[in-house]
């Protein structure tokens, strides 16, 4: 990065999950950081505020020609601040291009895949940090900059092929699935992006072995597969899933690597952990230390975040794709096998809702009862040709639409688990329910 630490780094869209993480990394490494965004509150700004990073409202007057402007991917060059920076001749660099440049001095590990990126990056960062100095950037708004870091672990998003800016030493690839239908044309189009990424990895790829698309990857570096099959290089055996978490033995081919206990739920989290263990194993880290660090993992933001209110368990999860909904419900059933599971889902984007309508209905029907919230449009689309009622008609386990002003139908359930899922603002429905539940007299045994 040269001698640019004394420059002022201005983040356009600092409340974005990746942008806030990167801002924290730079701040903790001693860089001078500030940013701007809309005035609406986002959960990502809490850590920025705790760290003393200034957050300003969007205004072209925030920009000075001597600063380095890091532009969030959601904002075009015509945005008032970016346009002013270009006009003044300030250095403007996109988020993913900045990261590509920033990671060069480190042993870099990119975590990518259609699902599971954030949880896997969080676990990887937690494990590595407990063993060696590590900087990391997680998609839940968490970032950490270690002054003398050996490793840099980061989440690499496939949306609009942004991850092709990176040439990491290692990559964990969790899966390939059809998502982001506003950009990708087909599953083959998604695969082509991952195939290009595979050619850019410098040392090795760790890929989920039960994914038929990942099995087709071609690369100049070794591809190590992890999973439960005898064909996998890194295998989980003797898996035990209980209400306390999951435990399993790990083998490299027929060589015993170690016994691991993961305080997380769902088959998908075991697979995510295998990817992390594989990286640590091939980097020759102490497997006993890896197991110890894994035992203390507390999870990441908005991934099966739970609380108890009255007689109810309330879960908040970012799941916004059918595969993620299935995984979240699977985790809930593992932890609470004797409780009714109530799903409250807010679809994210009209294009995704249309493209995956039947798959959403099938996934949601794994719950005991389903409630829906109106579709959350993204910054790129505010309306579409699909209604939430269209999804509701395909769901067999309910499908009633609730509003923020009336979540009272959820009061019909007692001693159950209510799982709020979505990538939009589903948390406002959760908060409305929590408030209503707290103010309701119930017979709690």
From Swiss-Prot:
InterPro entries per record: Mur-like_cat_sf (IPR036565), Mur_ligase_C (IPR004101), Mur_ligase_C_dom_sf (IPR036615), Mur_ligase_cen (IPR013221), Mur_ligase_N (IPR000713), MurCDEF_pg_biosynth (IPR050061), UDP-N-AcMur_Ala_ligase_MurC (IPR005758)
Keyword Ligase among record annotations: yes
Molecular function GO labels: ATP binding; UDP-N-acetylmuramate-L-alanine ligase activity
SUPFAM superfamilies named among the record's database cross-references: MurCD N-terminal domain (SSF51984), MurD-like peptide ligases, catalytic domain (SSF53623), MurD-like peptide ligases, peptide-binding domain (SSF53244)
Keywords of this entry: ATP-binding, Cell cycle, Cell division, Cell shape, Cell wall biogenesis/degradation, Cytoplasm, Ligase, Nucleotide-binding, Peptidoglycan synthesis
Domain of life: Bacteria
Residues the entry annotates as binding ATP: 113-119
Major place of residence: cytoplasm
Compartments in which it is found: Cytoplasm
Pfam families, sorted: Mur_ligase, Mur_ligase_C, Mur_ligase_M
Protein name per UniProt: UDP-N-acetylmuramate--L-alanine ligase
Lineage: Bacteria, Bacillati, Bacillota, Bacilli, Lactobacillales
């Amino acid at each position: 990065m040269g001698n640019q630490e004394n420059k002022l780094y201005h983040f356009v869209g600092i409340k974005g999950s990746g942008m806030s993480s990167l801002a924290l990394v730079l701040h903790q490494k001693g860089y001078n950081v500030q940013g701007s965004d809309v005035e609406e509150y986002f959960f990502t700004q809490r850590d920025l505020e705790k760290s003393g990073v200034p957050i300003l409202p969007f205004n072209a007057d925030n920009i000075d020609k001597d600063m380095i402007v890091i532009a969030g991917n959601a904002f075009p060059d015509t945005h008032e601040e970016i346009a002013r920076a270009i006009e003044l001749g300030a250095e403007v660099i996109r988020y993913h291009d900045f990261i590509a440049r920033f990671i060069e001095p480190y042993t870099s590990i990119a975590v990518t895949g259609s699902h599971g990126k954030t949880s896997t990056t969080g676990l990887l960062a937690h494990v590595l940090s407990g063993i060696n100095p590590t900087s990391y950037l997680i998609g839940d708004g968490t970032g950490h900059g270690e002054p003398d870091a050996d490793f840099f672990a980061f989440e690499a998003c496939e949306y609009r092929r942004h991850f092709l800016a990176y040439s990491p030493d290692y990559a964990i690839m969790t899966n390939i699935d059809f998502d982001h239908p506003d950009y990708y044309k087909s599953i083959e189009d998604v695969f082509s992006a991952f195939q290009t990424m595979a050619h850019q990895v410098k040392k090795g790829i760790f890929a989920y072995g039960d994914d038929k698309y990942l099995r087709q990857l071609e690369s100049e570096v070794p591809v190590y597969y992890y999973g439960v099959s005898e064909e996998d290089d890194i295998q989980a055996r003797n898996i035990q899933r209980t209400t306390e978490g999951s435990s399993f033995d790990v083998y490299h081919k027929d060589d015993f690597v170690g016994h691991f206990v993961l305080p997380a739920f769902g088959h998908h989290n075991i697979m995510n952990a295998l990817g992390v263990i594989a990286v640590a194993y091939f980097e020759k880290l102490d497997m006993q230390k890896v197991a110890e660090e894994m035992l203390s993992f507390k999870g990441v933001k908005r991934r099966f975040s739970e609380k108890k209110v009255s007689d109810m368990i309330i879960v908040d999860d970012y799941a916004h794709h059918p595969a993620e909904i299935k995984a979240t419900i699977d985790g809930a059933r593992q932890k609470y096998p004797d409780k009714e599971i109530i799903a409250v889902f807010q679809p994210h984007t009209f294009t995704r809702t249309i493209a995956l309508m039947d798959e959403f209905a099938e996934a949601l029907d794994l719950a005991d009862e389903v409630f829906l919230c109106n579709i959350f449009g993204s910054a790129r689309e505010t309306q579409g040709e699909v209604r939430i009622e269209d999804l509701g008609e395909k769901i067999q386990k309910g499908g009633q639409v609730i509003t923020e002003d009336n979540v009272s139908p959820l009061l019909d359930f007692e001693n159950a688990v209510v799982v709020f899922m979505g990538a939009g603002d589903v948390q406002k429905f959760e908060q409305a329910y929590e408030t209503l539940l707290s103010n309701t007299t119930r017979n709690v045994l």
